[in-house]
């Protein structure tokens, strides 16, 4: 079952990732997308950390779709974080027939 939209957590300077939550039957699922994965999805390189929230909002539907697919493909463990890395972007594009955003 697909996850549903949660809230924006924001940028984590230590992990170089943008955090957000999604919901699974009312339970919060923590999610993150790496800087590199977000740039890959957007078709750019080296975006500054100050641009991450705007970048996330612009590509939110795709990012949440990827997180939901990763969650559904795994054996969810309570408290585990769904992490999106660059390796997940080509598979998403292949599955959706999308070349770039």
Please describe what each predicted stretch is.
Residues 1-27:
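Short, charged/polar N-terminal "headpieces" of proteins
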Residues 1-3, 31-32, 50-54:
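A generic short-segment signal for beta-strand/edge and adjacent turn/coil regions
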Residues 5-7, 25-33, 75-86:
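Short, exposed beta-strand "edge-strand" segments with a Pro/Gly-rich flavor and a Y/T-containing core
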Residues 9, 36-39, 54, 82:
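Flexible, active-site-adjacent loop/turn segments at secondary-structure boundaries
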Residues 19-44:
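A short, structured beta-strand/loop element
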Residues 44-101:
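Acidic, low-complexity intrinsically disordered segments
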């Amino acid at each position: 079952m697909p996850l549903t939209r949660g809230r924006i957590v924001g940028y984590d300077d230590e992990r170089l990732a943008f955090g957000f939550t999604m919901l699974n039957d009312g339970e919060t699922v923590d999610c993150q997308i790496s800087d590199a994965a977000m740039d890959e999805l957007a078709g750019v390189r080296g975006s500054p950390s100050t641009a991450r929230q705007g970048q996330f909002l612009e590509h939110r539907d795709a990012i949440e779709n990827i997180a939901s697919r990763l969650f559904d493909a795994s054996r969810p463990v309570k408290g585990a974080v769904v992490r999106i890395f660059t390796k997940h972007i080509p598979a998403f594009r292949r599955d959706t027939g999308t070349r770039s955003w």
